[in-house]
Regions:
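Conserved Rossmann-fold NAD(P)-dependent oxidoreductase catalytic core, especially the SDR/UDP-sugar
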Residues: 85-139
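SDR active-site strand-loop-helix element
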Residues: 6, 61-65, 100-105, 139-141
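NAD(P)H-binding glycine-rich loop region in Rossmannoid oxidoreductase-like domains
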Residues: 43-86, 90-94, 107-111
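Short-chain dehydrogenase/reductase
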Residues: 10, 77-81, 111-119, 150-155
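Adenosine-cofactor binding site in Rossmann-like domains, unifying the SAM/SAH pocket
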Residues: 25-53
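NAD(P)-dependent short-chain dehydrogenase/reductase
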Residues: 126-138, 142-164
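Active-site segment of SDR-like NAD(P)-dependent oxidoreductases
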Residues: 68, 106-109, 142-149
């Protein structure tokens, strides 16, 4: 299996890539039936041309790319909805209907710029599924915690632990 992870340098992406590498390299033997041949890491600094190559070859997409703390609220829609649109259009261009999982947030239920951008990305993914028949999954993260977590940035748990 070839897996594309977008947002691979972010907190969740970095942790996922490490877990996938452990599975691929047989350091984690909890899923013996899962065979990972390649992990395509794509982030904001990756050569843009590689997205097309990765979308042509991948068997599963974890879209973890997004914007959560922009300087301007307009960046939410560009980073969360805009990139999801580019990703799905690129998969369509290659006729690749592999499963796609998109990371979202419980904020998607709220009417604020961040929530609206996450909800727009979710809706786009559902439209993509209807159009292509691809299996899609939305995971709304309520809170995150783990290796590389930063207090006062991306985790209430890390902030709490830091403050005691």
């Amino acid at each position: 299996m070839k897996i594309l992870v977008t947002g691979s340098a972010g907190f969740v992406g970095k942790n996922l890539v490490e877990a996938l590498k452990n599975l691929r390299d047989n350091k984690d033997r909890t899923r013996p039936s899962l065979s990972i041949d390649e992990i395509f890491e794509y982030d904001i600094d990756t050569d843009k041309a590689l997205l097309s190559d990765f979308c042509r070859e991948c068997d599963f997409v974890f879209n973890l790319a997004g914007v959560n703390r922009p300087k301007d609220d307009g960046e939410f829609m560009k980073g969360n909805f805009g990139f999801a649109s580019l990703l799905l259009d690129t998969l369509k261009k290659h006729g690749n209907t592999c499963p796609v999982m998109i990371s979202s947030s419980t904020q998607a239920a709220l009417d604020n710029p961040y929530g609206e951008s996450k909800r727009a990305g979710e809706n786009l993914l559902f439209e993509y599924a209807e159009e292509t028949g691809a299996r899609v999954l939305v995971y709304r993260f309520p809170n995150v915690f783990g290796k590389w977590c930063r207090p006062n940035y991306n985790s209430a748990v890390a902030t709490f632990c830091n403050n005691i």
